[in-house]
Regions:
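Conserved N-terminal beta1-alpha1 strand-loop-helix module at the mouth
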Residues: 1-86, 93, 103, 152, ...
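Conserved anion-binding
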Residues: 49, 72-171
Length: 172
């Protein structure tokens, strides 16, 4: 399910971020998420099977929007797009990665942890940013403070969001 813009990513309340050790586990996981009402998934590039897992979900569970995360190098952008990613997610944005994400044919959620990073990424045309690591960077209080002067930017908080604090993030 290819996205031409990131709008669906800001309308879902939760994007599960998963690290899949074995590609064989990908399809059952995706089907379980879909059955539970979650149609977006971010697969991290933290295992050798990550891209194969993404390819399997894209081929077998077409109703899931598949993002590839932990994109940290321009080469990761190429591999993720070649695998069929619907969107890309990075934990941070070194200068070498910003342009690669901006040039990608799919939406990207580049990572930020400061107001300056958020403003820089917005200037590059990114309307949705990954706020990472959310909890240790100020969490809900940071988001409330930043959204006021920067209402045009949407944030996807990740890192430290769990069952104890998720409701406060979803309420934003």
């Amino acid at each position: 399910m290819l996205l031409s813009d990131p709008t669906p990513l800001i309308t879902v309340p939760v994007i599960p971020v998963v690290t899949i050790a074995r590609a064989a586990d990908a399809i059952p996981l995706a089907r379980a998420l879909l059955a539970g009402g979650l149609n977006v998934i971010e697969i991290t590039l933290r295992t050798p099977d990550a891209l194969d897992a993404a390819r399997a979900i894209i081929a077998e569970v077409p109703d899931i929007i598949v993002g590839i995360g932990t994109v940290i190098r321009p080469l990761d952008v190429i591999h993720a797009v070649d695998a069929g990613a619907d969107f890309l997610v990075s934990p941070g944005t070194p200068a070498s990665l910003i342009q690669a994400l901006a040039d990608a044919p799919v939406p990207a959620l580049p990572g930020c942890a400061t107001v300056s990073e958020a403003m820089t990424l917005a200037a590059f045309g990114f309307p949705v940013l990954k706020f990472f690591p959310a909890e240790s960077s100020g969490g809900v209080r940071w988001l409330k403070a930043v959204v006021e002067p920067l209402p045009e930017i949407r944030f996807c908080p990740t890192g430290g969001v769990n069952g104890d604090n998720a409701a406060s993030y979803i309420a934003l």
